[in-house]
């Protein structure tokens, strides 16, 4: 009660400044949307993206920031953690559930062989996994109402961001070629069958 949710996105103007995309974001619940656009925001690395997000978030003001675990392009899983570091606030990744308290949040994250429960004070940054919820499709009322919600646009200069020289430049992003399934079926439980099975693992 009394809380407000601001969606924040950064990127090249040609990509982020999209009325249809803004409306889609706002139809899913946020009270308003802030876009930070600049022609130099192309091919940014996590260190740069987190810097822009941190400066914009600091200007907006916040108690709790939610980030995805990773982006669709690089999935480096670094941006949210770097953002928390630059803002000087606690940051937890891999979060699968959240319970809010008075000035604190209790979160759970799944590790290899256990579920870890952590309590952190606000303000904070949380990087959530896909297990956090199952997004619902927005209703027609929400879609129509999204067009009336405010959208703020800032430039890099508005948040005091200067695009410095990159120490590392990503020239390409490659994915391993998907291997074809061999459909090898081994029946039996003899030593030879087990050895043959092991060879195909």
Task: Walk through the language-model features, giving the residues of each.
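N-terminal glycine-rich FAD/FM-binding segment characteristic of electron-transfer flavoproteins
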Residues: 1-201
């Amino acid at each position: 009660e009394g809380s407000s949710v601001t969606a924040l996105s950064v990127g090249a103007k040609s990509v982020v400044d999209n009325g249809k995309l803004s409306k889609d974001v706002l139809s899913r619940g946020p009270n308003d949307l802030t876009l930070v656009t600049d022609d130099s925001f192309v091919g940014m690395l996590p260190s740069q993206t987190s810097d822009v997000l941190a400066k914009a978030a600091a200007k907006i003001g916040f108690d709790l920031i939610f980030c995805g675990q990773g982006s669709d392009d690089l999935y480096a899983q670094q941006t949210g953690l770097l953002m928390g570091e630059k803002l000087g606030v606690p940051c937890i990744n891999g979060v699968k559930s959240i319970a809010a308290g008075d000035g604190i949040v209790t979160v759970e994250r799944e590790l290899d062989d256990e579920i870890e429960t952590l309590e952190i004070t606000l303000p904070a940054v949380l990087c959530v996994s896909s297990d956090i919820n199952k997004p619902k499709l927005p209703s027609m009322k929400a879609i129509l109402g999204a067009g009336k919600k405010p959208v703020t646009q800032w430039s890099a200069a508005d948040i005091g961001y200067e695009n410095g020289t990159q120490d590392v430049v990503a020239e390409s992003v490659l994915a391993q070629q998907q291997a074809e399934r061999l459909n090898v079926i081994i029946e039996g439980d003899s030593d030879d069958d087990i050895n043959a099975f092991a060879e195909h693992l």
